[in-house]
């Protein structure tokens, strides 16, 4: 599997590296580390009328920033090498979000990993800018890495580092499933991962209710609704059998709610999930609306990492 890991030196990006090392990617995966220097910092329209001294200072600053970015790449790459990963690195200058998507296209990447917020000292919130753009336009799956906090292990002790945490708790995956083509692709992605015997997977389907004027009461009693529930349960049964080949700890949940994304978030909190997986809807106008109403909302509000799967 080809993985692109975008880093900017922020704590969030550092957590993305931790997430990569804890995530059950195939051991022969190839990782490309990418750092993008925002061209706008040095190509600002207000910086056009500079004297020679100011221009020299700007060029020196740009050189220092590039050297710092290269050092950052080398540090993070060393972490990956020490953990046994095969890696390479890329340093680009341009618009961060656009460069991430461009590199993903050029290198035929299978999964892009970005932090949930950061941008170094600027502390710019990524969701709503860079990661939103990557989530929308990347030609592949996108993993938005978050640090959900360290959970107590079996003995009730709290790990002191992410590395210890890896051994203290299993992967707890919540797979949001609606039997669509993207959802089935998400299942295929999950079953392709080398999940260990401790991994826990909950396949969740949420049927949307129309609560206006208590229409949900009539909706629940209609034969069409009962047929939808029957079909949803059958689809969940197929999914649990597929994932059951990868790990024995699989269960299915069928829920009904007026707000699908809220119910998914509630379930993730209830199950103490450390990863939510959804099928990616794509880039079209209608699909963009769906993406904004479910996937992006979950990416914004989930307390754990979110993987939006899209085959390319």
Protein language model regions, located:
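Structural beta-alpha unit
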Residues: 63, 67, 71, 75-112, ...
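Gly/Ser-rich helix-loop-strand patches that form or flank binding pockets
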Residues: 2, 26, 102-155, 159-160, ...
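A short acidic, glycine-rich active-site loop
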Residues: 54-68, 221-234
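Small/aliphatic-rich secondary-structure junction motif
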Residues: 1-56, 166-221, 242-248, 253, ...
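Aromatic/hydrophobic pocket-lining residues that form π-stacking "cages" and hydrophobic walls in ligand
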Residues: 20, 76, 100, 134, ...
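Conserved beta-strand termini and adjacent loop/short-helix elements that scaffold enzyme active sites
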Residues: 34-36, 90-94, 145, 204-206, ...
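Aromatic/pi-system hotspot detector in well-structured domains
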Residues: 15, 19, 25-28, 33, ...
């Amino acid at each position: 599997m080809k993985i692109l890991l975008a880093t900017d030196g922020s704590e969030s990006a550092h957590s993305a590296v931790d997430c990569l090392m804890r995530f059950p990617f195939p051991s022969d995966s190839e990782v490309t580390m990418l750092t993008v220097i925002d061209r706008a910092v040095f190509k600002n329209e207000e910086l056009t009328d500079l004297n020679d001294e100011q221009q020299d200072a700007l060029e020196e600053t740009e050189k220092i920033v590039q050297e710092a970015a290269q050092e950052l790449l080398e540090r993070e790459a060393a972490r990956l090498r020490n953990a046994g990963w095969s890696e390479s690195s890329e340093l680009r200058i341009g618009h961060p979000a656009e460069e991430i998507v461009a590199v993903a296209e050029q290198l035929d990447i299978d999964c892009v990993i970005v932090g949930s917020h950061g941008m170094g000292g600027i502390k710019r919130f990524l969701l709503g800018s860079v990661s939103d753009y990557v989530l929308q336009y990347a030609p592949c799956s996108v993993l938005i890495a978050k640090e959900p906090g360290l959970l107590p292990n079996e003995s009730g002790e709290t790990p002191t580092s992410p590395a210890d945490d890896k051994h203290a708790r299993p992967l707890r995956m919540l797979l949001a499933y609606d039997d669509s083509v993207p959802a089935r692709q998400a299942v295929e992605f999950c079953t392709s991962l080398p999940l260990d015997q401790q991994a826990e997977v909950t396949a969740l389907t949420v049927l949307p209710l129309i609560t206006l004027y208590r229409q949900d009461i009539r909706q629940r009693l209609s034969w069409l609704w009962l047929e939808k529930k029957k079909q949803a349960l059958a689809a969940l049964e197929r999914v649990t059998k597929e994932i059951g080949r990868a790990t024995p700890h699989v269960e299915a949940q069928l829920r009904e709610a007026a707000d699908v994304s809220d119910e998914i978030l509630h379930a993730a909190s209830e199950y103490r999930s450390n990863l939510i997986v959804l099928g990616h809807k794509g880039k079209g106008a209608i699909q963009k609306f769906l993406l904004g109403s479910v996937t992006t909302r979950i990416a914004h509000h989930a307390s754990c990492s979110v993987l939006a799967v899209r085959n390319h």
